[in-house]
């Protein structure tokens, strides 16, 4: 049975809830949740097209010496054979997404983004 995000927020930390919500959005864009990888080990064989993402840092806002707006930044990479994929625009359209760069490596096009939640 799938849990709603509300149920998940009662089970996981705020950061993990944000990550799981992002994972769902990325899986929806890719159309295949099994090819969305969070911090995969280097020796793992990936299936393409794929989205790989890592925690890239964060920032916090404070008022009266109390943290009230924690943010997590994710480094997201779309890896596929198509250099002009519509998936690039779909990821760019996500809330707080910034397109960083793209390059070709080993015959695969890699598009890098930063997404803050």
Regions of interest found by a model, annotated:
Residues 89-117:
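Acidic-leaning, charged glycine-interspersed low-complexity segments
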Residues 1-60, 66:
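Small/polar-rich, solvent-exposed N-terminal microdomains that initiate assembly or binding
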Residues 70-81, 109-117:
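Oligomerization/assembly interface segments of phage tail-like spikes and tubes
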Residues 73-97:
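Short cationic/low-complexity microdomains
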Residues 62-65, 87-89:
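Short, charged, solvent-exposed linker or helix-capping segments at domain edges/interfaces
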Residues 61-64, 76-80, 99-103:
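Glycine-rich loops and low-complexity Gly/Arg-rich segments
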Residues 46, 67-71, 106-108:
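Short coil/turn motifs at beta-sheet boundaries
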Residues 36-37, 85, 112:
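Signature of extracytoplasmic/envelope-associated structural regions
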